[in-house]
Amino acid sequence: MSIFHINVCDLKKSIPDIRVGDEVYLSGTVYTARDAAHKKIRELIENGGVLPFGLDGACIYYSGPTPEKPGQPIGSCGPTTSSRMDVHTPLLMDNGLIAMIGKGPRSPEVIDSIKKHCGIYFCAIGGAGALCARSVKKYEVIAFPELGCESVKKLEIEDFPVICGIDCRGNSIFQKGCI
């Protein structure tokens, strides 16, 4: 297994080199979105609305960070269960999304969409929100502030630790004997 240090803006060209189980340290911009935000983003796409961020080449982190503590840029920001977003993911990938960060397995439809769009799914460490927060350098709420911790946030991250859970060929860390 390999180790990669990748800026999100260069992720698209790096995806074919990454395999299931590879360690990746991401830097750059990611956006948080959970269930409620995904529903709103879906409605915007379906109704021709303006999205709060461009999906082309974007990476969404399935997380609802807590407010920052004194002297820290953000509170805890661990991953949430990704399967809750599966109903929305193919549509978002059809509109340019290439990467997702979360925890747990994905549906066959999401795996097919990852293969179709040469995308990738990363797994972050569940239960380690404080560890994940160490890689966040700054954040801002950019959409749906009424959703509180589930609002869409723009995070600037540095060496955010993830593992490739599903690669662009559709191989999944959740398949028996995959790694």
Where are these regions (language model features)?
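Short, charged beta-turn/beta-strand-edge "cap" motif at the junction between a beta-strand
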Residues: 11-12, 23, 29-33, 168
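Short, surface-exposed secondary-structure edge patches
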Residues: 12-17, 52
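Short, structured beta-strand/loop micro-motifs enriched in basic residues and often containing a Trp
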Residues: 1-10
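Active-site/ligand-binding-proximal alpha/beta "capping" segment
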Residues: 88-89, 163-179
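A short acidic, often aromatic-flanked loop/helix-cap motif at beta-alpha or helix-coil junctions
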Residues: 11-14, 147-151, 171
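Feature captures the catalytic cores and cofactor-binding loops of soluble hydro-lyases/lyases
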Residues: 32-33, 37-160
